[in-house]
Amino acid sequence: MGLPKGFSSQRKRLSAVLNMLSLSLSTASLLSNYWFVGTQKVPKPLCGKGLPAKCFDVPVPLDGGGTNASSPEVVHYSWETGDDRFTFHAFRSGMWLSCAEIMEEPGERCRSFLELTPPTEREILWLSLGAQFAYIGLELISFILLLTDLLFTGNPGCSLKLSAFAAISSVLSGLLGMVGHMMYSQVFQATANLGPEDWRPHAWNYGWAFYTAWVSFTCCMASAVTTFNTYTRLVLEFKCRHSKSFRGAPGCQPHHHQCFLQQLACTAHPGGPVTSYPQFHCQPIRSISEGVDFYSELHDKELQQGSSQEPETKAAGSSVEEC
């Protein structure tokens, strides 16, 4: 039941790719002004030259006499009623700015979303921004840990530690991102109902940045699950291998590393202290990663001892042949 090394590295690469994708999407959505899009209902200006309003003029004399007066006052009447008296301008809003079309000239007018937010909702907006920054920061930390595990780690114990910390960072960042998205949605809905009269949207919907943020959250949680799965498989493989090593001594299972050292002491130096492994004597293992470090180093020591004993064995064999 060993875990193939290539399979483990593939899962680590998948976690790193998902984390990088989540980091890119979350950064793009944070900087975008397309969280919400819609239209604003703006009254048309009064009748005048160059304006598209449907108006007609009725001259009214100033002295109240007939229509042939020398200086009549002109009264403007419009045929438009209902929604025809308004224009609908497109607008877009994000965490930083809210921009809308203007009637006088082509272009947009942008205002700070913080200024549009009601005073009672500004604290929630600041919390939302803080959660978004923490979300991106933890994602960046998780990506660095996964990249370090892929490129520079050959020690299985260190790999376990990096995988565990990367998974925890991904989970925390995903939770903070979810909270930040929900808080900003609540702030926008309150601003749409209680904001300035000249800004309140007539109709609005979610923009591409909103969906991008939730896709980023999904990728972040998928990366966390994949990293946790890799960590669990490594731990199970470690336990399986070393349970086979101590299957012959069932009474020593609670403290199998100490019993293993005692067996080495008895087999290597009967009746004497252990001289080959002085640094491992009576050291309890407090975690899985320490156990992996312990057995990895112990295995290296055994290989070194075996390689040093081979020349002695060959020399002894040659001396016997000469005799």
Curated annotation (Swiss-Prot):
Keyword set includes Transmembrane: yes
Residues passing through the membrane, by range: 17-37, 133-153, 164-184, 208-228
Example of a GO cellular component annotation carried by this entry: endoplasmic reticulum membrane
Coiled coil found in the keyword field: no
Keywords on record: Endoplasmic reticulum, Membrane, Transmembrane, Transmembrane helix
Membrane topology field: Multi-pass membrane protein
Pfam families reported in the protein's UniProt record: GSG-1
UniProt cross-references to InterPro entries, sorted A to Z: GSG-1, PMP-22/EMP/MP20-like
Location relative to the cell: Endoplasmic reticulum membrane
Region of interest called Disordered, as start-end residue ranges on this chain: 302-323
Disulfide bonds: none
Main function: May cause the redistribution of PAPOLB from the cytosol to the endoplasmic reticulum.
Subunit structure: Interacts with PAPOLB.
Family membership noted in the UniProt record: Belongs to the GSG1 family.
Protein's name according to its UniProt entry: Germ cell-specific gene 1 protein
Organism: Bos taurus (Bovine)
Higher taxonomy: Eukaryota, Metazoa, Chordata, Craniata, Vertebrata
